[in-house]
Amino acid sequence: METPATEKPAGEKSGTEKIGVKRLGALSLAAIGVVYGDIGTSPLYTLKECFDPDHGIPSSPENVIGIASLVFWAIILVVTIKYVLFVMRADNRGEGGILALLALAIRATGGDRGLVGPLVGLGLFGAALFIGDGMITPAISVLSAIEGLEVGTPFFAPYVVPLTLIVLVALFTIQSHGTELVGRLFGPVMVVWFLTIAALGLTEVVGHPHILMAVNPAYGLTFLFTHGWIAFVVMGSVVLAVTGGEALYADMGHFGKLPIQMAWFALVLPALTLNYFGQAALILDNPEAARNPFYMLVPGWGLYPMVILATLATVIASQAVISGVFSLSRQAVQLGYSPRLDIRHTSDEEEGQIYIPRANWGLLLGIVALVVGFKSSSNLAAAYGIAVTGTMAATTILALVVAHRSWNWPLWLCLGLGAVFLAVDLGFLGANLLKVTQGGWFPLAVGLGMLLLMATWRKGRDILSRRLADGALPLDMFMQQQKDSTSILRVRGTAVFMTGGTDTVPIALLHNLKHNKVLHQRVVFLTVITEDIPRVSARDRVVVEGLAEGFYRITVRYGFFQEPDIPKVLRLCKAFGLEFEMMDTSFFLGRETLVPSTHPEMPEWRERLFVIMSRNAVSATDFFRIPAGRVVELGIQVQL
């Protein structure tokens, strides 16, 4: 049985064929404000880092044109061809992001255990690195913007770090209030940003048109082969031009594929190209400009207004990354890779606008440590690349699995694309691994730490589920016993027992029978299932089955972009003739007390870690939005 459809089917909003011209323009403007903040602020530091004095690369015409060519072709290959044209085809019912892609890849394997394990590990590590990226992006972006003050006068040098911290703390403090109002300004501000950097670059390109030779990839290849090892090191800075590429895919569900692609080709790509070429042309004319070519493009009268605009742009870029981490955290909870978290909606209209306190303050703590510890965008650049390139490589592999297994692309085509994409991704990753001791250790440490937490949680929950299933009574046997029994007293009201399995009796019910020796007039077994799709429509949300006199089984399905709301679900059951009066309904939940096993499946330290994570998880009452006054918790001791 099914409920009537009352909400839009999953993925429908991404159907670009239904988007009108005005709607397409509005979505493209919004995408410019959210999706392109990160990659749009990369010109602040990319070429500056490529010509870092530590690299020992002189600002000769051949080197300048060669590096400009590498930056241009990195953007074309990684962002335009890989993300905009290839990876964005792999939408999970309209949604993107590495965990959504992981769910697609697992589905594509058809349950092949030899593939599922490595793919899960790869996807989780990519997701963990994305969280590391979420710490570094706000730190390096805002730092690099405010460092523009130093170009005007050295007087501001001591104030760069304090001003950066003030901006970042303010940004994270407002998260709990939502960003709906200020978010309306993101698009227009970023349009002004892109038009401004394009105009600044165009001025220099017109004066030095021979910089356009950088469009020829031969100049980039010549630079690589001529400088060998040093060129390989420089590639670790070139990759900064494509940071934010993952955001295009991660935010696809908010805007749809076509608006993001339209914004890229119509404004973002031309603006970035003009600005990078303009910076390179400036260095050709004045090699001293290599110390901060972005701000040296700006006329003296416009420096401080540009610092303000750049700060606004980097705050917007930071907001996009913060929202991405919140979204990823929600997906991790729903897909079973994280303990339950306190997830709060900050908008009545936009489902994607959420606030997660633990993620928010954890990010801020890491960012403050980065700013105070590294002190400059140049120092942070070493830490930035590893997180970005690691996630990009993981995305490439997962997308290729989907292309071959789900889209039935021929193996030779997938291998060919994989060879090109992975050569670039792994080349960038290798160049950044050279910087592990200079700061690259930070995102690796964050990534490995988050991977450990997610893997431990998933493993621990699997063990716990098996332990509970081992001692569970089959539901059909229990129902037969109830038919034959006349000794169990039935009392007024409805009892809802939440259970993870649909064919076993909840342990909480058995404990209730054992201690209270009664059953309610109506007994409901409620199972909540999270599907590997972003959203489940209302018409497919609930299935109600009558098991026997007074016994019902309700199965509820959600997507990994949706949060459970049990009272709302129970109201939907009225369509099945099953009506709930909250003041007459009791919810029985089992609270597990975990104890170490004599034959552990995990090392003792991981068991302890899992226990700590379990204790700190948000209660089932709060997570499922069950009225606290109607909940009865029954303690259950479970041996891991």
Swiss-Prot record:
User: Pfam families, per this entry?
Assistant: K_trans (PF02705), K_trans_C (PF22776)
Q: Which UniProt keywords apply?
A: Cell inner membrane, Cell membrane, Ion transport, Membrane, Potassium, Potassium transport, Symport, Transmembrane, Transmembrane helix, Transport
Name-wise, this protein is Probable potassium transport system protein Kup 1
Annotated PANTHER family: LOW AFFINITY POTASSIUM TRANSPORT SYSTEM PROTEIN KUP, OSMOTIC STRESS POTASSIUM TRANSPORTER
Subcellular location(s): the record lists: Cell inner membrane
What is the protein's membrane topology class?
Multi-pass membrane protein
Q: Reaction(s) catalyzed by this protein?
A: K(+)(in) + H(+)(in) = K(+)(out) + H(+)(out)
Q: What domain of life does the native source organism fall in?
A: Bacteria
Q: Which residues cross the membrane?
A: 24-44, 67-87, 116-136, 154-174, 186-206, 222-242, 264-284, 296-316, 354-374, 382-402, 411-431, 436-456
Family recorded in the similarity comment: Belongs to the HAK/KUP transporter (TC 2.A.72) family.
Q: For this UniProt entry, what is the primary localization, expressed as one broad class?
A: membrane
- Report the GO terms under cellular component: plasma membrane
